[in-house]
Amino acid sequence: MTASRRAPETVLVTGGGGFLGAAVAGRLAARGDRVFSFSRGEHPRLAGLGVEHIRGDIADAGALERACRGVEVVYHTAAKPPPWGPLSDYRRTNVTGTAMVIAACRRAGVKRLVHTSTPSVLFSGRDLEGVDESTPYPPRWHSPYAATKAAAEQQVLQAAAAGLPAIVLRPHEIWGPGDPHFVPRILARAHRLRRIGDGNNLIDTTYIDNAAQAHLLAADRLGENPG
């Protein structure tokens, strides 16, 4: 299957009102797919992107199953982000929510699942360089976000091993036009952040267009090679 010959698909983006979710949904709509967004809030800007919005809770099994009916690909970008909140909130959204998405995909016969994770699942407080998907998880995690995202991606990988065509992506510190978090935080704290190390420390970041396109390419490749 080539990009020029691919048939339009019906897809669902969880967390479609978020920074990454909206970018993924917009790109999908722009290439001709029928796109549904699933999230708790109202997001009028999605209509301008050609996206149909379904309002629902990520931990609501019935709502998710209804949203997945007739859908071929699910992009699961919804998550509770760091850094604040009780562990129970992270578990509900990131762990229970992902379990509900997987179950809905199975019941509705969804063909492919693309799950957004994070490199934080590998972070143990030490520098990470040259890591890949074979790098093992740390003995413990330093935040509820990392711990619950690790549990979530393990659920997806287990579902994939059991036959659901699924893939996990780990973009880091996504930024770009419309960024509500990364760059604004840096600018707001300019000259007030504590310096760590000798000033030569590196951090990987992901531009929003690249992150969104990676999700589309992952789904397309998964369609070519479900195994």
Predicted regions and their residues:
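Conserved glycine-rich Rossmann-like NAD(P)H-binding loop of the short-chain dehydrogenase/reductase
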Residues: D33-G41
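N-terminal Rossmann NAD(P)H-binding glycine-rich loop of SDR-like oxidoreductase domains
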Residues: T10-R31
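Active-site segment of SDR-like NAD(P)-dependent oxidoreductases
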Residues: K80-P81, P119-F123, T135, H172-W175, ...
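Active-site Tyr-X1-5-Lys
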Residues: R140-I167
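Alpha-helical substrate-binding/gating segment
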Residues: L187-L193, I203-G227
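NAD(P)H-binding glycine-rich loop region in Rossmannoid oxidoreductase-like domains
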Residues: R45, V51, R55-T96, A104, ...
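Glycine/proline-rich active-site loop of Rossmann-fold NAD(P)-dependent oxidoreductases
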Residues: A150, L164, W175-R185, L217-G227
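Conserved Rossmann-fold NAD(P)-dependent oxidoreductase catalytic core, especially the SDR/UDP-sugar
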Residues: T96-Y145, I167
